[in-house]
């Protein structure tokens, strides 16, 4: 195969590779510019399907370098169909998503966030995103607004004079940050990003803080990006630099050892991308997690291509993002996306 045969530009939306068959000379020798899905019917032995497929192999290339996710058949047949549907509907976003995951795998957090943001800005000007945005605008225009506005700041900040996370801990103060857009299920808007970044910047400068607790008010921790703000930016370069300048992701990563995030209900998009940078995520049993952005013609843009692979690996991240499917707290705990389930 040559590069042209492996690219979404030439109409190759994805590649399917049977991991139960021996490698052939026709298999890719470089990273294809489209998602590569490995399929296997081998029993799950606790070892990853890729590890099983490589054992005893003398392949001239490392399979894991270009297989983006592995599907276990027949158990994940429906999931495979969901993934193919997403890729087919948004091939450019899907190819960009797996490309970013591949490239950021060995980068630092700040470097990864730079790559993610540049890719996100690029896709904001893509036909796939513009089509999704147009379709959504037509739908929203037919639905009357009924919600009342939330009152007060979009991030509630409170400082406690002593740590209260553990009765045995008596040193240092605790900063609590609560997302406060309950009627919008704490949809992550520009104002929330800016207020969260401001509070975290202050926390970074305050060495007397021992703990930081982040939570959300209302029925959901965070239902993802505020869709009413999607497509508003007219300057992709300015939007990119704004994301890097006011970056809760980068700040949470710097403060991670101090941070506990308590999540519940919907944890969509930014609602899991940001917590994944923290040292500890405590989830209520009703928590659900999803990365729907590829279906919009975008990629996760709140740091998820950097934070989530560090918890669950590149392939599970690709599986989550390309399917758009949600997982419950139990699955998230098995993968390592969260650290504990607690009411």
Task: Cite the ranges covered by each PLM segment.
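Conserved CoA-thioester-binding segment of acyl-CoA-metabolizing enzymes
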Residues: 1-30, 134-217
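Short, active-site-adjacent cap segments at secondary-structure transitions
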Residues: 98-99, 219-222, 268
């Amino acid at each position: 195969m040559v590069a042209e045969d492996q690219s979404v530009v030439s109409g190759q939306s994805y590649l399917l590779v049977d991991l139960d068959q021996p490698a052939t000379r026709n298999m890719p020798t470089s990273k294809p510019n489209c998602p590569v899905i490995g399929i296997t019917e081998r029993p799950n032995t606790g070892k990853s399907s890729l590890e099983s497929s490589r054992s005893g192999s003398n392949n001239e290339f490392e399979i894991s370098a270009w297989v983006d996710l592995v599907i276990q058949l027949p158990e994940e047949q429906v999931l495979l169909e969901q993934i193919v549907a997403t890729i087919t509907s948004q091939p450019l976003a899907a190819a960009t998503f797996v490309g970013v995951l591949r490239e950021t795998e060995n980068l630092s957090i700040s470097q990864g966030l730079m790559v993610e943001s540049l890719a996100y800005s690029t896709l904001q000007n893509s036909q796939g995103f513009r089509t999704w945005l147009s379709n959504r605008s037509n739908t929203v225009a037919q639905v009357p607004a009924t919600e009342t506005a939330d009152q007060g700041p979009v991030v509630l900040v409170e400082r406690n004079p002593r740590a209260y996370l553990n009765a045995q801990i008596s040193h240092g103060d605790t900063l609590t940050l609560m997302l406060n857009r309950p009627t919008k299920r704490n949809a992550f808007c520009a104002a929330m990003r800016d207020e969260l970044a401001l509070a975290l910047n202050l926390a970074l400068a305050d060495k007397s803080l021992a703990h930081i607790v982040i939570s959300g008010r209302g029925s959901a921790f965070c239902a993802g990006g505020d869709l009413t703000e999607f497509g508003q930016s007219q300057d992709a370069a300015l939007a990119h630099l704004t994301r890097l300048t006011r970056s809760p992701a980068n700040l949470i990563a710097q403060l991670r050892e101090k941070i506990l995030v308590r999540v519940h209900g919907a944890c969509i998009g930014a609602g899991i991308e940001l917590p994944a940078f923290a040292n500890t995520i405590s989830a209520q049993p009703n928590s659900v997690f999803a990365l729907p952005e590829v279906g919009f013609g975008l990629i996760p843009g709140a740091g998820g291509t950097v934070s989530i692979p560090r918890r669950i690996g590149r392939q599970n991240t690709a599986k989550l993002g390309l399917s758009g499917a949600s997982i419950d707290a139990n699955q998230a705990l098995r993968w390592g996306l969260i650290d504990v389930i607690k009411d």
